[in-house]
Design a protein with these regions (language model features):
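N-terminal cationic and glycine-rich segments that engage phosphates or anionic surfaces
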Residues: 2-21, 25-59, 162
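Residue-level signal for pocket-adjacent positions within structured domains
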Residues: 3, 18, 45, 71-72, ...
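A general secondary-structure boundary signal
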Residues: 16, 31, 35, 61, ...
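Conserved, well-folded catalytic cores of nucleic-acid-processing
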Residues: 23-26, 34, 38-41, 63, ...
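Internal alpha/beta loop-helix hairpins
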Residues: 48-82, 86
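Non-DNA-binding regulatory cores of transcription-related proteins
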Residues: 77-157
Length: 162
């Protein structure tokens, strides 16, 4: 793991906990049962159920270790408890005016919560990094592959992020 803090919203933390619970209490026991059944069928070298089951169990164990480490390092930050401010920090929901004239709303969340379909961007992404500490009404510059883009910040809110 890196030295970068693992900031996460309460919803993101619950999501990781739910996934860990699912893996530990449902998926892994099912795979163990399949592997035990397949092992009892004799020759394991050509036993597809056994080989697949062992591979899947390793994948699950790897994911369990990853989730456990991420949750242990997590620093839960609730955007709803932040005092009203027009300055952008982790957990902010920001409405922007892009160069092409379109408005876009993004939510600045933790690394484990990224979801572009819901406009959730990581707090260490290039866009979020140029927004952090800026205020409503400010204009920030984002370096993109197409060149520099000036972005106007229209609104900053700290609301619940699901």
């Amino acid at each position: 793991m890196s030295d970068t803090p693992n900031y996460i919203t309460p919803a993101g933390w619950r999501s990781l906990k739910d996934e860990l619970y699912q893996l530990v209490n449902k998926e892994r026991p099912e795979i163990v049962q399949i592997v035990n059944w397949a092992a009892s069928n004799g020759d394991r070298s050509e036993n597809g159920d056994y080989l697949y089951g062992k591979r899947r169990m390793r994948e699950i164990d790897r994911r369990i270790r990853f989730l456990t480490k991420r949750l242990e390092a997590a620093q839960v930050v609730d955007p709803e408890t932040r005092e009203a401010t027009d300055q952008i920090f982790f957990g902010a929901t920001v409405t922007l005016l892009r160069r092409n004239g379109s408005e876009q709303t993004v939510k600045i969340v933790g690394i484990d919560e990224i979801d572009t379909a819901q406009n959730k961007i990581s707090w260490i992404s290039p866009l979020a990094r140029c927004l952090i500490k800026a205020r409503e009404g400010d204009e920030v510059s984002l370096n993109t592959p197409e060149g520099r883009e000036d972005i106007e910040i229209l609104e900053v809110a700290y609301v619940r992020i699901d």
